[in-house]
């Protein structure tokens, strides 16, 4: 009898442990779906408050299933208002008085470190933006012998050699030699686009230099993009940028990187750089590269040249979304996955709808129209393949051209984030069998309570589709988490249901 009582007491203790110590919801489960957020848009105010905004938002992000954020370039640019892509001093994270300011557009180094600490406390990873193609805002000019090249064919020289004054000397008067004593001179670069002595904008290649050849072959050779182009054939440069990468990761306790403008940077160096930082930090350092080309073959070539050691943004999928949103219902929705990275290399695809370059007024403007954005987010957030990214500008709205600003769509994206966090698990079944209405289902996973879903999107008229969600879900009543449809769906004994969607809309059905 005493033994039975002791056994009962132990079982009771174990039961309480299970109740209070195990995760209370799917959100805390070990297999929580990963969701990345790009936490900025191009026209963020130059108020120095962005790192504080990020810190204050950390609880909200965690609640809605965001597991990682990509922060904007954290280092000093050409001015305080620089978005960060005119990189001046990679070691100044808002700490030194340079370019007329201590803080960057986003705030100070200390504020950023506090924000990252807050994110980490909520199990949100932080990916730093890496801008290492060029340097802008040099401290002084240098006399350099150079030739002009044809902008349409960078391999074709169109002038004789002559002297120019190039902005290529970086000595960082505010920082000095803190963190690094490396000073940049003309011979650390391949070329530039400005001759200060003649006030001429041309593409100049420096004497004795050659464009890096492991780059995109657009314009003959697309090594040169802007400012002073970094020469990765120079061993001192390669060593310094590797050293900086390790410092950057350790100084901010980063968990990964977003690599900017990789089609202009020597591919083998990027491969080696990622491997080097991973080795030195002892961390996985998830890395995604921005290779901007609507061409699966070009992206596959990059993945191959970098030994598939990091991911790429699925640019072709973005352009499919853009096309679908602009063709007035004439787009064939069955083709959404055609020639996309996620269809060929799902483990290397970061899927997205829009970003700071595609938003209105920007260099790669190809904005997905507002009505289609919820459909696109349902597509990337509730399917099994790809690592989806949510854009700050879609959640909170964008600024810039007041006639073309993106409105805040948080109220429409939140239910889709909830669907990803709590329901988008298990085997997937696709129904890409109609020009307008396409759908997919997830059967759910026994380790995530009440999981499973059925999603429909259409760029044309509304309608219905009979879809299979698994016999294990028979008898359940499902409802549309987006609120777009009000009628419930009862799953039949064979695991099938008939799901409806409104015209030009999305519906995601989950267990009530």
Curated annotation (Swiss-Prot):
Site description Transition state stabilizer, residues in chain: 357
MF (Gene Ontology): alpha-amylase activity; calcium ion binding
Annotated consequence of substituting residue 233 to X: Great decrease in thermostability
Annotated positions binding Na(+): 190, 212, 223, 229
Signal peptide (residue range): 1-29
Residues given in the record as Ca(2+) 1 binding sites: 133, 223, 229, 264
UniProt-recorded name of the protein: Alpha-amylase
Catalysed conversion reaction: Endohydrolysis of (1->4)-alpha-D-glucosidic linkages in polysaccharides containing three or more (1->4)-alpha-linked D-glucose units
Active-site residue list: 260 (nucleophile), 290 (proton donor)
Binding site for Ca(2+) 3: 329, 331, 435-436, 459
Cofactor(s) for this UniProt protein: Ca(2+); Na(+)
UniProt organism field: Bacillus licheniformis
């Amino acid at each position: 009898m005493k033994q039975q009582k002791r056994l009962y007491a132990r079982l009771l203790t174990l039961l309480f442990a299970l109740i209070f110590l195990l995760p209370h919801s799917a959100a805390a489960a070990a297999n929580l779906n990963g969701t990345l957020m790009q936490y900025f848009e191009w026209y963020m105010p130059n108020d120095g408050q962005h790192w504080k905004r990020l810190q204050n938002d950390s609880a909200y992000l965690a609640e809605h299933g965001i597991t990682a954020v990509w922060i904007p370039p954290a280092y000093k640019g050409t001015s305080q208002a620089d978005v960060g892509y005119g990189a001046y001093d990679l070691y100044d994270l808002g700490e030194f008085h340079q370019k007329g300011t201590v803080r960057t557009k986003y705030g100070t180094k200390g504020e950023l470190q506090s924000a990252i600490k807050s994110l980490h406390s909520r199990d949100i990873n932080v990916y730093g933006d890496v801008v290492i193609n060029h340097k802008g805002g040099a401290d002084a000019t240098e006399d350099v012998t150079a030739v002009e090249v044809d902008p349409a064919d960078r391999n074709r020289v169109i002038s004789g050699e002559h002297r120019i004054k190039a902005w290529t000397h970086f000595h960082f008067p505010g920082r000095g030699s803190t963190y690094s004593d490396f000073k940049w001179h003309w011979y650390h670069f391949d070329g530039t686009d400005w001759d200060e002595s003649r006030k001429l904008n041309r593409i100049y290649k420096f004497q004795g230099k050659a464009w890096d050849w492991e780059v995109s072959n657009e314009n003959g050779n697309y090594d040169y993009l802007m400012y002073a182009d970094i020469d990765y054939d120079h061993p001192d440069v390669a060593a310094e940028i590797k050293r900086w990468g390790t410092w950057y990761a350790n100084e901010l306790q980063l968990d990964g990187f977003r690599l900017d403008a990789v089609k202009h940077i020597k591919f083998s160096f990027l491969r080696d750089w990622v491997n080097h930082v991973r080795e030195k930090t002892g961390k996985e350092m998830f890395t995604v590269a921005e290779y901007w080309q609507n061409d699966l073959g070009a992206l596959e070539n990059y993945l191959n040249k970098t030994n598939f050691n990091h991911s790429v943004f699925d640019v072709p999928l973005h352009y499919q979304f853009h096309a679908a949103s602009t063709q007035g219902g004439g787009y064939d929705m069955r083709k959404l996955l055609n020639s996309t990275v996620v269809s060929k290399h799902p483990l290397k695809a970061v899927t997205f709808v829009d970003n700071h370059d595609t938003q209105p007024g920007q260099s790669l403007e190809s904005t997905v129209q507002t009505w289609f954005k919820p459909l696109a987010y349902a597509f990337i957030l509730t399917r099994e393949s790809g690592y989806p990214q949510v854009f700050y500008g879609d959640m909170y709205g964008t600024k810039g051209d007041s006639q073309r600003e993106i409105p805040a769509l948080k109220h429409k994206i939140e239910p889709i984030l909830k669907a990803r966090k709590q329901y988008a698990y298990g085997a997937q079944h696709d129904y890409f069998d109609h020009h307008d209405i396409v759908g997919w289902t997830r059967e759910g996973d026994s380790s995530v309570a009440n999981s499973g879903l059925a999603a429909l999107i259409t760029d044309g008229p509304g309608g219905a589709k009979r879809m299979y969600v698994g016999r294990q879900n028979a008898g359940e009543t499902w409802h549309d988490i987006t609120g777009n449809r009000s009628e419930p769906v009862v799953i039949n004994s064979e695991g099938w249901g008939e799901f409806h969607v409104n015209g030009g809309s999305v519906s995601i059905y989950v267990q009530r």
